Design a protein with these regions (language model features):
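Extracellular carbohydrate recognition
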Residues: 12-35
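A structural motif detector for short, solvent-exposed N-terminal "entry" segments of globular domains
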Residues: 38-91, 142-145
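Acidic glycine-/aspartate-rich tracts in secreted/extracellular proteins
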Residues: 11-14, 38, 73-79, 89-93, ...
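Conserved beta-structured recognition patch
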Residues: 82, 136-221
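Short aromatic-acidic-glycine turn motif
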Residues: 87-101
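Low-complexity, Pro/Thr/Ser/Gly/Ala-rich linker/spacer regions in secreted
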Residues: 31-43, 216, 220-229
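Extracellular beta-strand-rich recognition modules
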Residues: 2-15, 19, 115-116
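Intrinsically disordered, low-complexity Pro/Gly/Ser/Thr-rich segments with frequent PxxP/GP/PP motifs
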Residues: 98-124
Length: 229
């Protein structure tokens, strides 16, 4: 916080009228205390949000095997546990920080990190352990559906948000019709390119065995199909 000195005084005497420009109130001797609204600088960024429709092959996560969050380290991070993730469900507002990285986790600048519900499922669907620098098994808090906003936290403070915690895009219909600002990613993904979010298209992973079988190959997996490298 910072202290700001301001002063109040009136020009024009006791008979000053508010319509008289010569009779203005000026500021004198008062101290205001305020906190900066700027978010702290983050060395971790949201890069992709996945809600893939992966067939359950006994992965044991109650149908959540296609859910994952892709983050990118923009600098070396010695302790990832200062970062966390929150899933804001159905436009109901923030639910706060729900997942924290382990204190033993670290990252190198440029690392693509995938936080998943099932490592086995993501390896089968997109060879994740080869494509990503790290694949981390997350908790049940990685629970997003295609209409849920995602919040990235640093030391308990939100530093980035995908979507809008107070909006449920499903209320506009699957895919949101012609709304260019829509961020629905049901059975699909969202991916950041040049600071802008792009989308695979609602339901584009339905009925596919791998990302390369779909009409919406996950961008980091393009050209990475195991038998075509």
């Amino acid at each position: 916080t910072r202290d700001v000195r301001v002063m109040f005084y009136k020009n024009g005497g006791t008979g000053a009228a508010p319509t008289n420009l010569n009779n203005l109130w000026y500021i004198d001797t008062a101290t205001l205390n305020f906190a900066s609204a700027l978010a702290p600088s983050s060395d971790l960024a949201l890069q992709g949000i996945l809600d893939l429709n992966i067939v359950d092959d006994g992965y044991g996560v109650n149908g959540s095997q296609g859910k994952a969050i892709h983050v990118l380290a923009t600098a070396d991070i010695a302790d990832l546990s200062i970062y966390g993730i929150g899933v804001a469900n159905n436009g109901g507002g923030t639910d706060g920080e729900e997942y924290n990285f382990e204190s033993t986790a670290s990252a190198t600048a440029g690392d693509n990190i995938l936080v998943v519900r099932s490592v086995e499922a993501m390896n089968a669907y997109m060879d994740a352990s080869t494509i990503f620098d790290q694949v981390i098994l997350g908790s049940s808090s990685i629970s997003q559906n295609g209409n849920d906003a995602i919040e990235l936290y640093l030391n308990g403070t939100i530093v980035e948000v995908f979507g809008d915690a107070d909006v449920n895009p499903d209320t506009f219909g699957a895919g949101c019709g012609d709304d260019v600002n829509c961020w629905d990613y049901e059975d699909s993904w969202a991916y950041k390119i040049g600071g802008e979010w792009t989308y695979g298209g609602v339901n584009c992973s339905d009925g596919t065995a791998t990302t390369w079988d779909s009409t919406c190959v996950y961008p980091l997996a393009i050209g990475q199909e195991p038998d075509k490298k």
